[in-house]
């Protein structure tokens, strides 16, 4: 009986490892595909002080307002990335102006870069961890908590209190992902890593 139990336990562990590897591979494939279809927006505060965090949100609003007014309509993701790359001076100027208007003299930088992001949920959309292209705005020492959203497709909150993202942005995201990929990113939780051990042990 003990040998039988150990055999089943080893089989269950091997099954779990195989399932984990398959799920990890599927998540990596999803992340790679998703990364090619979005442009994220990342604002890093000077520090975690209340004043610096408040300033971060004001800079965020200024940059989003600037881009909403200037970004041509109907661009695809690659054209949006290129537009952002060629307009970083204007984006930085908008951020700098907001910083000065609020009585600070922090330096600020703006660049389109590739950065690593951990798993993040924004509204009802979850992005798996990995490298993504992002418009990155750094205020001062950029050591404070960051704020992020997705510029393309537009998933930046319309209602920050209730975490409502624009339906148009979600529809664009749905168009470029498979049905299963879209289901995964809108499932409202972390990506599942399924192990068969509990089920197998429960059947003993």
Regions found by a protein language model. Name each.
Residues 124-191:
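Soluble extracytoplasmic domains of inner/organellar membrane proteins
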Residues 46-48, 115, 140-142, 154, ...:
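Generic structural motif
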Residues 185-204:
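Low-complexity, Gly/Ser/Thr/Pro-rich intrinsically disordered linker/tail segments
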Residues 2-19:
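Hydrophobic membrane-insertion alpha-helices, especially the h-region
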Residues 37-88:
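Early exported N-terminus immediately downstream of N-terminal targeting peptides
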Residues 77-150:
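Mid-length scaffold segments of soluble, non-membrane domains
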Residues 50-52, 119, 146, 158:
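Intrinsically disordered, low-complexity acidic/polar segments
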Residues 18-33:
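Aromatic-capped interface at the extracytoplasmic side
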């Amino acid at each position: 009986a003990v040998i039988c139990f150990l055999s089943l336990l080893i089989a269950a562990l091997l099954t779990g490892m195989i399932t984990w590897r398959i799920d990890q591979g599927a998540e990596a494939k999803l992340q790679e595909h998703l990364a090619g279809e979005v442009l994220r927006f990342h604002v890093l505060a000077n520090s975690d002080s209340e004043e610096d965090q408040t300033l971060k949100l004001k800079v965020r609003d200024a940059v989003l307002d600037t881009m909403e007014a200037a970004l041509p309509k109907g661009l695809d993701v690659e054209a949006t990335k290129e537009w952002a790359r060629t307009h970083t001076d204007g984006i930085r100027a908008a951020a700098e102006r907001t910083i000065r208007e609020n009585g600070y003299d922090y330096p600020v930088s703006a660049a389109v870069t590739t950065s690593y992001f951990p798993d993040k949920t924004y509204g009802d959309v979850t992005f798996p961890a990995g490298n993504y292209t992002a418009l990155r705005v750094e205020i001062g020492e950029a050591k404070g908590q960051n704020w992020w959203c997705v510029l393309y497709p537009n998933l930046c909150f319309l209602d920050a209190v209730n975490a409502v993202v624009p339906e148009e942005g979600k529809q664009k995201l749905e168009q470029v992902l498979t049905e299963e990929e879209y289901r995964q990113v809108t499932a409202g939780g972390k990506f599942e890593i399924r192990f068969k051990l509990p089920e197998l042990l429960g059947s003993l």
